[in-house]
């Protein structure tokens, strides 16, 4: 009986000395959108080049620019700029340097993609929500090549450039 009274007393004492803490609240997730795209394509330099398709943003695909030019002789240059626009609400940044691809034939041809001031596009370059940066694309038939380096037939070059963006 004493043991039973002792257990009941300890149980009541424990119950009297215990409590439950609760945390209650609400959180609202605001609407956000991701919208990094191209806008405002402008040809800036055409020297000795024939433009068969001016650079344009692909309809329905604002993350792609296409163009078609013929560089007619050594020293020919074609250059255009395009804005990279962050029309979303989330800050973005480049995740890597641009990847240039295609059969660029570097002995006779230069293909560069830089910021409009000529500085290289590097990883971790920020693009704030609502901001834009201008990219310059330049293709050039080198003028300081030898006769042996000249192509013996028209050569189509398929050029690509990818600039990866991620959330900052």
Place the predicted regions along the sequence by residue.
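Terminal low-complexity, poorly structured segments
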Residues: 1-2, 96, 123
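Short, polar/proline-rich extracytoplasmic segments that appear immediately after membrane translocation
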Residues: 1-63, 153-157, 166-168
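Surface-exposed interaction patch
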Residues: 8-12, 16-21, 34-39, 66-115
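Intrinsically disordered, low-complexity, compositionally biased regions/tails
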Residues: 29, 52, 64, 79, ...
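Intrinsic-disorder/low-complexity loop/linker signature
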Residues: 46-49, 60-61, 102-104, 115-119, ...
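Beta-strand-rich interaction surfaces with strong enrichment in secreted/lumenal proteins
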Residues: 66-70, 121-127
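C-terminal, structured domain-capping segment
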Residues: 72-101, 129-168
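Strand-loop-strand motifs at the edges of beta-sheets in extracellular beta-sandwich domains
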Residues: 111-114, 119-121, 125, 133-138
């Amino acid at each position: 009986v004493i043991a039973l009274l002792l257990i009941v007393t300890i149980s009541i004492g424990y119950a009297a000395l215990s409590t439950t803490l609760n945390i209650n609240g609400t959180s609202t997730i605001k609407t956000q959108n991701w919208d990094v795209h191209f806008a405002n394509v402008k040809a800036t330099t055409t020297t000795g080049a024939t433009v068969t398709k001016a650079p344009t943003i692909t309809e329905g695909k604002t993350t792609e620019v296409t163009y078609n030019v013929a560089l007619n002789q050594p020293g020919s240059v074609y250059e255009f700029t395009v804005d990279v626009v962050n029309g979303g609400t989330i800050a973005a940044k480049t995740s890597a340097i641009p990847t240039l691809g295609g059969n660029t034939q570097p002995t006779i041809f230069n293909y560069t993609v830089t910021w409009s001031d000529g500085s290289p596009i590097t990883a971790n370059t920020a693009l704030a929500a609502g901001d834009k940066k201008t990219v310059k694309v330049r293709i050039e038939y080198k003028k300081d090549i030898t006769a042996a380096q000249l192509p013996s037939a028209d050569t189509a070059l398929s050029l690509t450039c990818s600039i990866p963006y991620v959330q900052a």
